[in-house]
């Protein structure tokens, strides 16, 4: 009863129970330490070694995980980190815990005496023993790839004094004699090294090592023994059949070279007792197992790289391969290594050329008898990079690719097809031409290498008017029908023959592949007329729904990403501004000289290359890296820019010591004659640098190489060597005005030789590049050098 005699009920409206107070529990603080130990391992794996050390210092629990678990160190990343006295303990600890990258880099660092300074006394012996230890460890950690460490210690060896390569070889051999396990791959590497000597005794030793390695289970050694015994087995049908069975066994176990040889052996199926259907199935399995790996992933990793930049790099590599007469397989493997590395690791634009030439050094050592030495590779880049830069890049590449150098290429499948099917020589050359053109275009990587090789053969046979371009036999061998190949054929034709190639600043297309196949060895096949798009559609029996595909790069501007070095300065200035130059420049050498220069130089260029090749020029094991290669190489001004003629600035060659009387205005007629000279077949200009309007910049192009008087350089003959060049790129700003300046002619190009005014001998004058630019412009420049 309430007040006033009012009765209240117990409803919720009249009566309220006191509410219960809910006590909020304080949430438990969860940190990274609360995660299970297995999850922490996955987080710590693949971190860089610097990050692992930083995490280790955070908490005692993390410190225990890092210190007591080998898997953390085995998976640690040493990307862009090189052994030095300060971090040597980290590298050694990681290598001993099973880190492949650390072991490879330590072996290379000791072999080339790079980063780890060792006293000159007994340096080869000390470094050789240490390099042997880590190379052996790297080979034991090598999983799924053929033995590879032999490519670092292969001949030529030094003939004077102690040789670090020889010390490594002997140390590895002694290790194999002491240890019973994990020595099959080491024995194979020792055999590969000895097999490259011409001495019969060493050849026999190599054969014995291969036999021992094969007995220990090395599949690659077993295949090499089969290859050496193949010639003798052919004479006896019984032995031939036994040899074929062994080859089939090696192929089934995964040896790529054995798989290729097995497919080629099916050409003699009757002698082997195989039915046509069985032999076709063997080849078909090889072709159908080929998988496409899109190279467009490169551009998702390399944000500053585009298809045109890659085109220029590959075009330059083709020129190097042509100059050094490397095989198509070597070229294709080099490009594959470049693309695989670009998909895995970020590469600044100014290091693209370094990556390309380092991949070529590795691939020539792995598959060729004639190699590209480190010193010669540095020379080919016009000394843009140093000896140690290339050595370190080799370590980065091998570790990033996990020692796997040999991969299937378009050339492999093409060779199988040309072995199994009778094809005219002209058609073979055209097929090879198409396969190398495919290297330049990443969009063609959407097709598997086997399909691309089949499409190249079909297009070649169509071009040469074959009545049955794709027979039933080819269908059975490859598993690709005529209709399956039509899209690939159309894409291949469009990219190779319709789309315009990037052009340099003189609107000269970059056509290194075409020039390569203008040689008589290939029947000058690149000069033949090809089918038009409409003719190809008619030959394929498909309707042409649209007009001929439009070309790209025909108009508009493509910003330059490569640049020549800014002038030849003194050695001290070059060393002081090394990082500045590396961030802005790249050059390339010219491959050929004019007839006048060849007459003057005689065999000097050959002598220069001889001095830069082989072990005596390389001095790799001795660590003699000081000094620059004296022979200057020309610079490829491969500029990918469409120039408006009104904005084109006059460009002429210049020397470091220009003559004062040449400072006046240049004769317009002489300039016109100079700019009309056709490009030489050597490497083309790769890069341009931006400059401010009105600034005087002197440059040299191919005209300076092809028309310079051989006797007008300096007394001697060195001045007529291939000359570096530089080029200019237009500013992207819409308000950029045409540049007007007084260009002066090169003393080497225009002036006859004059006697010295005094008895003091004149200093050697070298062709230079002068590119005046601002710091802001440097940030927008990328490079590639040949």
UniProtKB/Swiss-Prot annotation:
Disease the record associates with this protein: Frontotemporal dementia and/or amyotrophic lateral sclerosis 5: A neurodegenerative disorder characterized by frontotemporal dementia and/or amyotrophic lateral sclerosis in affected individuals. There is high intrafamilial variation. Frontotemporal dementia is characterized by frontal and temporal lobe atrophy associated with neuronal loss, gliosis, and dementia. Patients exhibit progressive changes in social, behavioral, and/or language function.
Motif D box 2, residue numbers: 343-346
Annotated localization: Nucleus; Cytoplasm, Perinuclear region; Cytoplasm, Cytoskeleton, Microtubule organizing center, Centrosome, Centriole
Gene Ontology terms: biological process: cell division; G1/S transition of mitotic cell cycle; negative regulation of centrosome duplication; placenta development; protein ubiquitination; re-entry into mitotic cell cycle; regulation of cell cycle; SCF-dependent proteasomal ubiquitin-dependent protein catabolic process
PTM description: Degraded when the spindle assembly checkpoint is activated during the G2-M transition. Degradation depends on the C-terminal PEST sequence. Phosphorylated just before cells enter into mitosis.
Domain Cyclin N-terminal residue range list: 288-405
Single GO MF annotation: cyclin-dependent protein serine/threonine kinase regulator activity
Comp. bias intervals (Polar residues): 723-738
GO cellular component: centriole; centrosome; cyclin-dependent protein kinase holoenzyme complex; cytoplasm; cytosol; microtubule organizing center; nucleoplasm; nucleus
Note on domains (UniProt): The nuclear localization signals mediate the localization to the nucleus and are required for CCNB1 localization to the nucleus. The D box motifs 1-5 (amino acid sequence RxxL) are involved in substrate binding, such as FZR1/CDH1, and may be ubiquitinated.
Similarity comment: Belongs to the cyclin family. Cyclin AB subfamily.
Chain location of the short sequence motif Nuclear localization signal 2 per the record: 568-574
Note: Founding member of the F-box domain protein family, which obtained its name from cyclin-F.
Extent of motif Nuclear localization signal 1: 20-28
Induction trigger: Down-regulated in an ATR-dependent manner in response to DNA damage induced by doxorubicin, camptothecin, UV-C, methyl methanesulfonate, nocodazole, or gamma-irradiation. Down-regulation in response to DNA damage is required to allow RRM2 accumulation within the nucleus and for efficient DNA repair.
Subunit structure: Component of the SCF(CCNF) complex consisting of CUL1, RBX1, SKP1 and CCNF. Interacts with SKP1. Interacts with CUL1. Interacts with CCNB1; interaction is required for nuclear localization of CCNB1. Interacts with CCP110; this interaction leads to CCP110 ubiquitination and degradation via the proteasome pathway. Interacts (via the Cyclin N-terminal domain) with MYBL2/BMYB. Interacts with FZR1/CDH1 (via N-terminus). Interacts with RRM2 (via Cy motif and when phosphorylated at 'Thr-33'); the interaction occurs exclusively in G2 and early M.
Purpose: Substrate recognition component of a SCF (SKP1-CUL1-F-box protein) E3 ubiquitin-protein ligase complex which mediates the ubiquitination and subsequent proteasomal degradation of target proteins. The SCF(CCNF) E3 ubiquitin-protein ligase complex is an integral component of the ubiquitin proteasome system (UPS) and links proteasome degradation to the cell cycle. Mediates the substrate recognition and the proteasomal degradation of various target proteins involved in the regulation of cell cycle progression and in the maintenance of genome stability.
Native organism: Homo sapiens (Human)
UniProt cross-references to Pfam families, sorted A to Z: Cyclin_C (PF02984), Cyclin_N (PF00134), F-box-like (PF12937)
CDD domains per the UniProt record, alphabetical: CYCLIN_CCNF_rpt1, F-box_FBXO1
Protein name: Cyclin-F
């Amino acid at each position: 009863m309430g007040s006033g005699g009012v009765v209240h009920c117990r409803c919720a409206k009249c009566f309220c129970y006191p509410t219960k107070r809910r006590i909020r529990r304080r949430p438990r603080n969860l940190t990274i330490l609360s995660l299970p130990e297995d999850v922490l391992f996955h987080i710590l794996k693949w971190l860089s070694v610097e990050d692992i050390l930083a995490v280790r210092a955070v908490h005692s629990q993390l410190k225990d995980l890092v210190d007591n678990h080998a898997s953390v160190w085995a998976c640690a990343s040493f990307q862009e980190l090189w052994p030095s006295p300060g971090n040597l303990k980290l590298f050694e600890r990681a290598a001993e815990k099973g880190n492949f990258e650390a072991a490879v880099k330590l072996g290379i660092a000791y072999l080339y005496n790079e980063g780890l300074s060792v006293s000159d006394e007994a340096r080869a012996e000390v470094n050789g023993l240490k390099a042997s230890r880590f190379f052996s460890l790297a080979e034991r950690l090598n999983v799924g790839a053929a033995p590879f460490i032999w490519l670092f210690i292969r001949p030529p060896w030094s003939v004077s004094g102690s040789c670090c390569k020889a010390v490594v070889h002997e140390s590895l051999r002694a290790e194999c004699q002491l240890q019973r396990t994990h020595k099959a791959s080491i024995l194979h590497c020792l055999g590969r090294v000895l097999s490259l000597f011409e001495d019969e005794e060493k050849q026999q030793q190599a054969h014995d090592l291969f036999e021992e390695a094969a007995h220990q289970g090395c599949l690659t050694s077993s295949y090499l023994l089969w290859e050496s015994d193949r010639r003798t087995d052919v004479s006896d049908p019984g032995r031939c059949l036994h040899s074929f069975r062994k080859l089939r066994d090696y192929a089934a176990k995964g040896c790529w070279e054995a798989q290729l040889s097995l497919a080629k052996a099916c050409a003699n199926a009757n002698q082997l007792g195989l039915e046509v259907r069985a032999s076709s199935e063997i080849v078909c399995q090889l072709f159908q197992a080929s998988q496409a790996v899109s190279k467009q992933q490169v551009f998702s990793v390399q944000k500053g790289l585009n298809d045109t930049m890659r085109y220029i790099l590959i075009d330059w590599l083709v020129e190097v391969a042509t100059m050094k007469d490397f095989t198509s397989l070597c070229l294709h493997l080099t490009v594959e290594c470049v693309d695989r590395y670009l998909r895995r690791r970020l590469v600044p634009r100014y290091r693209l050329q370094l990556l390309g030439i380092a991949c070529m050094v590795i691939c020539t050592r792995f598959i060729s008898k004639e190699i590209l030495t480190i010193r010669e590779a540095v020379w080919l880049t016009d000394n843009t990079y140093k000896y140690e830069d290339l050595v370190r890049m080799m370590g980065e590449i091998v570790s990033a690719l996990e020692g796997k150098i040999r991969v299937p290429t378009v050339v492999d499948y093409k060779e199988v097809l040309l072995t199994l099917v009778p094809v005219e020589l002209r058609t073979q050359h055209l097929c090879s031409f198409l396969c190398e053109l495919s290297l330049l275009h990443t969009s063609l990587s959407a097709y598997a290498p086997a399909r691309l090789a089949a499409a190249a053969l079909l297009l070649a046979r169509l071009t040469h008017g074959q009545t049955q371009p794709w027979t039933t036999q080819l269908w059975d061998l490859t598993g690709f029908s005529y209709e399956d190949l039509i899209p690939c054929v159309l894409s291949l034709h469009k990219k190779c023959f319709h789309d315009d190639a990037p052009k340099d600043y003189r609107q000269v297309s970059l056509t290194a592949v075409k020039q390569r196949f203008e040689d008589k060895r290939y029947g000058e096949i690149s000069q033949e007329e090809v089918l038009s798009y409409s003719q190809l559609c008619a030959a394929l029996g498909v309707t042409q729904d649209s007009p001929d595909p439009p070309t790209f790069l025909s108009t508009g501007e493509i910003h330059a990403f490569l640049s020549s070095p800014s002038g030849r300065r003194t050695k001290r200035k070059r060393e002081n501004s090394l990082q500045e130059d590396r961030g802005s420049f790249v050059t390339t050498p010219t491959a050929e000289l004019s007839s006048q220069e060849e007459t003057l130089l005689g065999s000097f260029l050959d002598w220069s290359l001889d001095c830069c090749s082989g072990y005596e020029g390389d001095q790799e094991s001795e660590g003699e890296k000081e000094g620059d290669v004296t022979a200057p190489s020309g610079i490829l001004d491969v500029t990918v820019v469409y120039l408006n003629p009104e904005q084109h600035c006059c460009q002429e060659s210049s020397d470091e010591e220009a003559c004062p009387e040449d400072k006046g205005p240049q004769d317009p007629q002489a300039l016109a004659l100079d700019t009309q000279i056709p490009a030489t077949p050597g490497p083309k200009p790769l890069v341009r640098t931006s400059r401010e309007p009105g600034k005087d910049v002197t440059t040299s192009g191919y005209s300076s190489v092809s028309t310079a008087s051989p006797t007008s350089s300096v007394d001697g003959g060195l001045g007529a060597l291939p000359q570096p060049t530089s080029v200019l790129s237009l500013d992207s700003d819409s308000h950029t005005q045409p540049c007007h300046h007084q260009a002066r002619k090169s003393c080497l190009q225009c002036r006859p030789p004059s006697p010295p005014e005094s008895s003091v001998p004149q200093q050697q004058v070298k062709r230079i590049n002068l590119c005046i630019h601002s710091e802001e412009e440097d940030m927008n420049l990328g490079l590639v050098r040949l």
